[in-house]
Design a protein with these regions (language model features):
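Conduit-forming functional cores of very large proteins
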Residues: 1-327
Length: 327
């Protein structure tokens, strides 16, 4: 989250927004100053710190596919598409034309019309892409060509530098000031047009900005990070039936390797894990500042009162093999 009006802004690209932001279970002085409770920028995950497979070495993490299907780590990415209509010294300028219509091509069958002009469908009557339509890059495997949907049906002058002389005929003038098609095509991943802004620049050029919104889910190679900067890439996304589980039937959202703690020396993250688990059962957000925060012994006592280990460890059962281990 960057501001309260980020849904109305078109000056930031790409704009990454978490779909389900959550208030952190463990807070600190810096988070209170930044008002992360009102503008959260993360999700609370059920993390199992254990060495479970070879897919979590070198700071890699293992994700639960069922958690991803429930919305864990889902983001909305908005990218800006900018187009301009220029004016040239000889008085010519770029123009926008209306998209071709079906009734204008009477001798063309429907299949040919769809193949040749389907990428003009997102355009409105003014030749500019409409809000709410889906744009993408279309692939025609039969005729072996790839083209993106048209965002602006723009035409540019053929001649942009020569002026008209006194001895020019009407035919020469018509040739010199004719336009050629230069439609602006979409070249990114498919998405929905969120908003369209038409404005002008300092040079009196027309400027058209379109924000295209796309939904993304975590995939292999994506980087995750905790609030302590303990980051790692996704090494494996597996089904919930393959994940370890506790005797209470709790499956983790993520598995991270414990060998990353000694090398990174992130002792505060160990305290955050213990305080977060204690706050989950105590119903109180803990203070995770390493100096002067919530006492670690108090968090351990809370865990003991709720039937857990003093050190925060749990016995988990493998979903793949007939084994159990500590987490």
């Amino acid at each position: 989250s960057i501001a309260c009006n980020q849904q109305q802004r078109v000056d930031i690209s790409p704009l990454n927004l978490l779909v389900y932001p959550m208030m952190p279970m463990v807070r600190s002085r810096v988070l209170d100053l930044l008002h992360f409770s009102q503008l959260p920028a993360g999700q609370n995950a059920m993390v199992a710190v254990m060495s479970y497979s070879g897919y979590d070495i070198e700071d890699a993490v293992v994700l639960n596919k069922a958690s991803i299907d429930r919305g864990y780590g889902r983001v909305v990415i908005s990218k800006k598409q900018v187009f301009s209509l220029k004016k040239y010294p000889n008085g010519t300028q770029d123009i926008i034309k209306a998209p071709p219509r079906r009734e204008e091509q009477k001798g063309m069958d429907d299949a040919t019309w769809e193949r040749l002009f389907e990428h003009y469908k997102p355009l409105g009557e003014d030749g500019i892409v409409e809000v709410g339509v889906y744009v993408k890059v279309r692939t025609d495997w039969v005729h072996s060509y790839v083209h993106g949907d048209i965002l602006v049906n723009k035409e540019i002058p053929v001649n942009t530098g020569d002026f008209i002389g006194d001895n020019c005929t009407y035919i020469v003038i018509d040739i010199m000031f004719s336009n050629t098609a230069a439609p602006v095509k979409y070249k990114e991943n498919g998405g929905y047009v969120d908003k369209v802004l038409i404005t002008t620049t300092d040079n009196e050029y027309f400027l058209i900005k379109a924000m295209v919104r796309d939904m993304r889910v975590p995939e292999l190679g994506d980087k995750f990070s905790s609030r302590h900067g303990q980051k790692g890439v996704v090494g494996l996304i597996t089904g919930q039936e393959n994940m370890p589980f506790t005797n209470a039937g709790i499956y983790p959202d993520m598995i991270m390797n414990p060998h990353g703690f000694p090398s990174r020396m992130t002792v505060g993250k160990m305290m955050e894990l213990l305080a977060g688990k204690a706050g989950l059962y105590d119903g109180e957000r803990k203070f995770g500042t390493i100096f002067g925060g919530t006492n670690v012994e108090d968090c351990a006592e809370i865990l003991v009162q709720h039937g857990f280990s003093y050190c925060g460890k749990d016995v988990m059962y493998s979903g793949t093999y007939d084994k159990n281990g500590l987490c």
